[in-house]
Amino acid sequence: NGRLYRKDLWDEPFTGTVIENFSDGSLSLKTSYYRGLPHGQQVRNFSDGQRALEANFDQGVLVGVKSRWWPNGVIREEAYWSEGKYIGRRLWDRTGRLIKEEITPQS
């Protein structure tokens, strides 16, 4: 069903924050869950601590802007979501030059 459950209570969907760390203890991934579904902000870092990804969820559905960065800290992509539907994106190269911009027609 796509939900995350607590290990000690298999019949209860997990509500809380899941944190994954690199071997040195620094943050790799942080995701908030509500009733087993991603809810709120998700962040992922590169091993050097630089931000790699930020996304926002509303009860398992992507909303707003999902951003990704190159390892050098330059923005790589901004993907736009509304109620789980992909709207469009902008892409940049490693130097920060915008290389693509697309918008999906809404029905």
Q: Where are the regions a protein language model picked out?
A:
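Glycine/tyrosine- and acidic-biased, solvent-exposed loop/turn segments at the edges of beta-strands
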Residues: 1-107
